[in-house]
């Protein structure tokens, strides 16, 4: 029988007790919730995306549940601003990565400089939120802007940082290549996909913003493809995200080339026990297949 150390993952100068991570989202906004998620079994935590100034976000409705395993959301990147969150996590002892969002290179540089001294593992640079103007994907669709942001973040922190990519107007492989060339530690793939739902009785969009981001089961095949192509063609660390509810989902991402996996929608469907459940399933899979550790299966699908 293999031990718990078989779940340990090491990549980009980081080490987690298991490959499951809290995805950036509504649970990552307070120290209390972050610590609770870590105690519930997550290997690492990612905060909600933080901006230079507080963002109120959109009015309700902001989330649509499609089938229990797929959602469309447009929260509008609501957050208290990075300075308020920095005060919230002053005493942080959990393995935490801060997600940052901005409109310009200077936004990211300012935040990184101020946050770098905190007890955190590193940063995730959100260049792919699909429903907020002048942020996220609108920034990420400009290859030269992405290049400039990644280059300046690298100059201003020695910590690992990952570029969160989505499916937009630019080939995700080109974006990942820029991230690699400008010395990002890796990428997270993928963010939600631009989507919409309309009330057939009223004829109006259901979300207050009209357009939102599709997440959950519906985007998993797209996410698997993106992880597979980035990992196989570029050979950089990839954190997989999109539709992970079970250990089988997580293993599929690992086989595609993900070094770790982020879970968001799965919490809404299965609760915070999903982290331990997935880790237990991965360990049983490794044992049944004769593998020694998670690293043995990362990218195995590249052989075919």
Model regions and ranges:
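Alpha/beta catalytic cores of nucleotide-metabolism and tRNA/nucleoside-modifying enzymes
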Residues: 1-3, 214-235, 245-304
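N-terminal capping/small domains of soluble enzymes
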Residues: 1-96, 101
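Hydrophobic faces of well-ordered beta-strands that scaffold small-molecule active sites
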Residues: 20-24, 43-47, 96-100, 123-125, ...
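Glycine-rich beta-to-alpha transition loops that act as phosphate-gripper elements at the mouths
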Residues: 25-27, 99-103, 165-171, 220, ...
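Catalytic cores of alpha/beta
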Residues: 31-36, 107-117, 169-182, 232-234, ...
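Glycine-rich phosphate-binding active-site loops on the catalytic face of alpha/beta enzymes
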Residues: 47-52, 127-133, 186-196, 243-244, ...
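Glycine/Thr-rich beta-alpha phosphate-binding loop at enzyme active sites
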Residues: 70-74, 79, 130-144, 175-232, ...
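Conserved alpha/beta-domain cores
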Residues: 100-157, 165, 173-185, 189-190, ...
């Amino acid at each position: 029988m293999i031990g718990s150390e078989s779940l340990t993952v090491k990549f980009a100068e980081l080490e987690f007790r298991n490959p499951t991570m809290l995805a950036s989202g509504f649970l990552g906004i307070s120290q209390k919730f972050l610590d609770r998620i870590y105690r519930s079994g997550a290997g690492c935590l990612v905060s909600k995306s933080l901006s230079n100034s507080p963002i109120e976000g959109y009015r309700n409705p902001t989330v649509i549940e499609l089938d229990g395993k797929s959602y469309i959301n447009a929260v509008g990147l609501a957050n208290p601003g990075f300075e308020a969150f920095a005060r919230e996590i002053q005493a942080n002892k959990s393995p935490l990565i801060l997600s940052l969002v901005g409109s310009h290179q200077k936004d990211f540089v300012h935040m990184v400089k101020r946050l770098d001294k905190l007890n955190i593992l590193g940063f995730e640079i959100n260049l792919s939120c699909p429903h907020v103007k002048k942020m996220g994907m609108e920034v990420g669709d400009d290859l030269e802007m992405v290049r400039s942001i990644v280059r300046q973040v690298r100059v201003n922190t020695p910590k690992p940082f990952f570029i969160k990519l989505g499916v937009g107007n630019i080939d995700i492989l080109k974006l990942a290549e820029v991230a690699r060339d400008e010395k990002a530690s890796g990428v997270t793939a993928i963010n939600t996909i631009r989507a919409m739902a309309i009330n057939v009785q009223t004829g109006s969009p259901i979300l207050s913003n009209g357009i939102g981001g599709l997440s959950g089961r519906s985007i998993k095949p797209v996410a698997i493809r993106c992880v597979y192509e980035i990992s196989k063609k570029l050979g950089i660390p990839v954190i997989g995200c999109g539709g992970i509810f079970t250990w089988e989902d997580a293993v599929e991402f690992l086989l595609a080339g993900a070094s770790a996996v982020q879970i968001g929608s799965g919490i809404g469907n299965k609760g915070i026990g999903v982290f331990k459940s997935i880790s237990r399933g991965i360990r049983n899979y490794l044992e049944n297949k004769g593998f020694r550790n998670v690293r043995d299966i990362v990218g195995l699908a590249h052989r075919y």
